[in-house]
Amino acid sequence: MTPLMVKGTLFGLLLLSAAVWDMRNREIPNLIPALLLLCGLIGFRPAASAAGLLLVGGPFLLAAVLIKRDGFAIGGGDVKLKGACGFVLGVWPGLIQTVLSLSLAVLTGLVECRLQKQPLSAVRLPLAPFFCFGGVSAYWLTAFALQI
């Protein structure tokens, strides 16, 4: 098994554990982003990892700090998870993860809004399952298909 495959497998398993934990408990334990950072050391590219951490995780930190409104919350666990994902993936795959994750989260929120017959602002979704889908998709897409 190549280092790229080991890294991708660990990345996927850690994101899956974050997704399950977030769905059950509505929080993400600090250990998961810490282990993701360690996973990012496999095939470590310092500039890409640092840029990914800042440019992928940074907007989530800003949103969590600046947007305070009923019905909208990005938790600290989500911010740490996205920063760690950016560290593992780098900038472009991290941005692909963000677009895929948030697009699916919005679609899911709209469907739930319709099914539950409640306003969109009342829908509460854990984000880690969407980050898991987007992260695994972005990793394997960029690792093998696009060769970025």
Predicted regions and their residues:
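A membrane-topology feature that recognizes alpha-helical transmembrane segments
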Residues: M1-I148
